[in-house]
Every structure is written in structure tokens, then in C-alpha cells.
Amino acid sequence: MRRGFKIIFSLLLVCLLLWGGKSLLSSGYRFFQEMLYPVRYEEIVGKEANEYDLDPALVYAVIRAESSFREEVVSNKGAYGLMQITEPTFEWLQTKMQDSETYTVEDLYRPEVNIRYGCKLLSILLGQYSSTETALCAYNAGMGRVGEWLADEAYSSDGVTLHTIPYPETENYVAAVMENYSVYQDLYHFDWNGGTLHVEKK
């Protein structure tokens, strides 16, 4: 009887240890994911995502893919800041905005300016193309090049949707952003309350 009790007790102890270990492992993995997929600049992202009717998770996905949240990064193609905006694109976007202030390219190092104009660009592209993936192609490769791809039957059968992305860099970029997007949606709940963005961990 006593021996049977010891066996049952041992089995229960093993189960508890396994459950605790699994829970600890799950918590550790979650913490690691949140470190890799952070939420920063909530006030700025919330304001601009709300103004341009964007999913904050997508904005964060683009920022992570473009700059890994480094404010002062400059690419070898001359793209600046968090959302990696080039000077010609920045100048063009300023003609589409109603801002009273005229900015210089150095202002793209400022998160509030970079995110504002990056969100404006995303909004324009999402309104122009039929899918998020095609809009992201244009964000990376430019609207002119995407227009050429859509006109080519080798890449688009209907002139609206790309079934093949001919540039490996752009293909990898779109895949990275969409993966980021999925993870941000899984990790966080973005809630609008009185026009203010609230971020909660799921």
C-alpha cells in the first residue's frame, strides 16, 4: 500500500515538474518573442495609423523589416530612418501632405516625421494596389517597377495581382514583412480607445 502510494506520488511529482517546465519554457519563449518583436513609439504609431486607417501591427512589421527600430540608420540606397524613406520619395510625399512645415532629409531621423510619412506612403500604396503584398512590393521596389511587373504576363495574369515577384530582394522583403505582421498580430492586441492606441499582450 505504502509502495503504491509512493509510486502515485512520484508520478504526480513528475507530471507537475513536466507541466511547470513546459509553462516556464512557454513563458521564456514568449518573452524572447516580445524582445524580438517590440512595440515602441506607441503614441506616434497610434496617431498616424489612426489618421491613415492602417493596422498598427502592419506599421510595426514594416519598421522591424526596414530598420529594426534604429532611428538613424541609412541604407546603401539612401533610405533614411525607421521606415527607410528615400529623399526623392520624401519630397514627393510632402507634395501630398498638408503640413505647414517644410522638412529636409535630416528630419527623417526624427521618429515622428519618419513614421508620419512612412504611414502616408503605406496608405497611398494600399489604396492603389489590390493586396497588401503588392503594396509592399511597391514600398520596396517602387511604384514604377511594380507597374512594369503587373503589365508583364510573366509576373501577373490579370494586371492587378502579382503571382511572381521577379526581384529576390523584394520577394524576401515582402515575406519578411508578412511574417512580422503575423507575429505582431499573434503577440499583441491593438485597441483604439478614445482615439488613443492601447497595446495589450495576448
Regions found by a protein language model. Name each.
Residues S23-K202:
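Catalytic glycan-binding domains that act on GlcNAc-containing polysaccharides
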Residues M1-R3:
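N-terminal Lys/Arg-rich, disordered targeting/topogenic segments
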Residues K6-L24:
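Hydrophobic membrane-insertion alpha-helices, especially the h-region
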